[in-house]
Amino acid sequence: MGSRKKEIALQVNISTQELWEEMLSSKGLTVVDVYQGWCGPCKPVVSLFQKMRIEVGLDLLHFALAEADRLDVLEKYRGKCEPTFLFYAGGELVAVVRGANAPLLQKTILDQLEAEKKVLAEGRERKVIKDEALSDEDECVSHGKNNGEDEDMVSSERTCTLAIIKPDAVAHGKTDEIIMKIQEAGFEILTNEERTMTEAEVRLFYQHKAGEEAFEKLVHHMCSGPSHLLILTRTEGFEDVVTTWRTVMGPRDPNVARREQPESLRAQYGTEMPFNAVHGSRDREDADRELALLFPSLKFSDKDTEAPQGGEAEATAGPTEALCFPEDVD
């Protein structure tokens, strides 16, 4: 009776210093997903890594996972508000990619793999780097007081909005494709949470549509299976992320989208109302309300906002202004 070939795990879990040292001694290029315990590894890039493993092979390309809180060597990466991918070759750091930016990850992997092949085959000098971004101005963790209570928060001072990949797109296995297109459009995904919305959540979320004839059908659809709830920001400047995301989604009705914006997400992945694949906030005010409703455990603040003089009420920023993640979110 023939024995089955043992399947090799895509990403090796590095949980001890010994395993870290073993990783550094590996021949070739190793891509390490350094993640925070409260949010877990970066799932959207797994399909990319699987694809590259098939195309490139595992002889010189390796993938690993490492929780920042478990390894002293990763102390400076603790509390970071976005995924961090460290590239190691010959035991040295050769590249860093921040954010779940699939096109950039793919390019960096191919470039660094080619460079390492030349080091091994031709004796070329390996280009080693230091992660210069680990400076005070880029620290995501801020220890301060909020309403008189001590809190640990992770802050990203860029405008953000809510996006939902709806149950119809998730059920058809289109989540990874949509996430890839979101990233290619220049968005950074700060949070990606998969869960099934409750009926109470959906009714409150879509209360502005309660008078529409198809409201009950919409409620049933949104409760029918898991959705992916995303918090998006833009990787380029402070442009209106809400409006930009609505443009990428396309018209609400997939049939209209296919006529007017055939490259939009709803044109490509929607079928008919209410199965239009994705949701986006209507405006900045709506984004504030939706983010607060679906992510009640997240804290929103603007560290640059100061109380006005003359006894006026203190100015506050909504969720679209600055996003703060409690470090202990499950």
Curated annotation (Swiss-Prot):
Upper lineage: Eukaryota, Metazoa, Chordata, Craniata, Vertebrata
GO cellular component: cell projection; cytoskeleton; dynein axonemal particle
Protein function: May be a regulator of microtubule physiology.
Species for this entry: Homo sapiens (Human)
Miscellaneous comment text of the record: Shows no detectable enzyme activity.
One GO-annotated biological process of the protein: GTP biosynthetic process
Keywords: Cell projection, Cytoplasm, Cytoskeleton
Protein name in the entry: Thioredoxin domain-containing protein 6
GO MF entry, a single one: nucleoside diphosphate kinase activity
Tissue expression profile of the protein: Detected at very low levels in testis, lung and brain.
Cross-referenced InterPro entries: NDK-like_dom, NDK-like_dom_sf, Nucleoside_diP_kinase, Thioredoxin-like_sf, Thioredoxin_CS, Thioredoxin_domain, TXND_domain-containing
Domain Thioredoxin intervals: 11-115
Chain residue ranges for the region called NDK: 157-303
Subcellular compartments: Cytoplasm, Cytoskeleton, Cilium axoneme; Dynein axonemal particle
Biased composition (Low complexity): 307-322
SUPFAM superfamilies per the UniProt record, alphabetical: Nucleoside diphosphate kinase, NDK (SSF54919), Thioredoxin-like (SSF52833)
Family label: Belongs to the NDK family.
Region (Disordered) residue spans: 300-330
